Amino acid sequence: RKGNAKLLFIAHREEILKPSIACLRQGLTDPNFGQLAVGNYHAARSEHLFMSIQTFNSQKFWEKMDPFYYDMIIVDEFHHAAAKGYQKLLNWFHPKILLGLTATPERMDGKNILNYFGGHMAAEIRIRDDIERRLLCRLHNFCIDDPVSLSNIKWTGGHYDIEELENVYTGEGALASQRARAIIQALERYTADMRDVKALGFCVSKKHAHFMADYFNRQGIKALALDADSPKDVRNAARQKLESGDITIIFVVDLFNEGVDIPAVNTVLFLRPTNSMTIFLQQLGRGLRLFPEKDCLTVLDFVAQANRKYDFASRYASLLGKNHVVIKKEIQDGFPHVPKGCSIQLEEIAARHVLENINSRLRKNEFYMDMVKELASATGHIPTLEEFFKATAIHPHTFYNEKH
């Protein structure tokens, strides 16, 4: 407030920087606080700077600054900080306070971002705690049988082959249309009034997103498709149409995963498998923001017969704070320990798929040995632990904290 302390705020998207500077201006009751350095915004001063990591690197900003210039550096979405693009920032500057913000501190590649903070978190609150404290809205999660089986889809590097997923989700045969029709039926079945739905549907590819939008529009449900390459004005216009109710759903790929708030979103559809809990939680978080006209978030999670290496249980564990062994009992008992006011319901066939998957993964010795053999065959050498975690998308916490 006294204007003496110098601040550098770093994020990787303009959509994060703009609300961040607005929030601090409001909190400090100073409408002129800070300057943006991102895209077409060029800052004239550096005392209180809100800069994208891309601008930081392209301008070689560190070369212009004393390492001790900033009193505080805030890095949003800090789970990105282990990436190469953040190393100049973190190694050059020596602020009095380094503050990292993230909803997903566990990286799937096993790299530990806590090393920048003496190995511990200063403060931590998880999604379950946020919901129970009413900092995020309640959710009703419906796990729906997916008519498409993924058991024969190619699996490499800890995930399904994107091209094969796209083909099965958008193919010219009857199966793709059957799946799209089942998605609409589920939306109608599990939402109170389609006229009130403001939804995001997360897709596997651009082609998949456009296929879904086209199908919905043909059925009289207004929809748009967006991806990371969509122009900013197109994205903004789509967001406004969703908020105003002019459209019902936006199908997206590689967009709205993180850092972008659309509080009016009241329905999230997971239309593709993801083995990354970081991405899953980020996408789920797009619908958890509080909003005056939103009582709860409806989550439609389409569960297919999966490759046995796919990890269903982690998404439930992230909401319940339980390990895979306990999750099996939670499913069998109807999820009695979800946050107050929330629910998780599995359709009969979906529940069978999930339990079969969990049982397979709980046979850990056999499962892990198969994974090691597969990686050794593909790479020509026995993988290190780091290589194993990165290739399989198994988090170290899961590996060390479960019986196997």
PLM segments and residue spans:
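A short beta-strand element within the Helicase C-terminal
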Residues: 249-252, 256-273, 279-282, 297-302
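Conserved segment of the helicase C-terminal RecA-like domain
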Residues: 277-282, 286-318
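Conserved interdomain linker/interface between the two RecA-like ATPase lobes of SF2 helicase motors
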Residues: 123-200
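Long, largely alpha-helical accessory region at the distal end of helicase-like NTP-driven motors
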Residues: 179, 189, 312-404
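Conserved helicase ATPase core of P-loop NTP-dependent helicases/translocases
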Residues: 18, 34-42, 61, 210-214, ...
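Post-DEXD/H (motif II) to motif III coupling segment of the RecA-like Helicase ATP-binding lobe
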Residues: 79-142
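Conserved helix-turn-beta segment of the N-terminal RecA-like "Helicase ATP-binding" lobe
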Residues: 7, 14-38
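Conserved helix/coil segment N-terminal to the catalytic DExD/H
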Residues: 38-72, 83-88
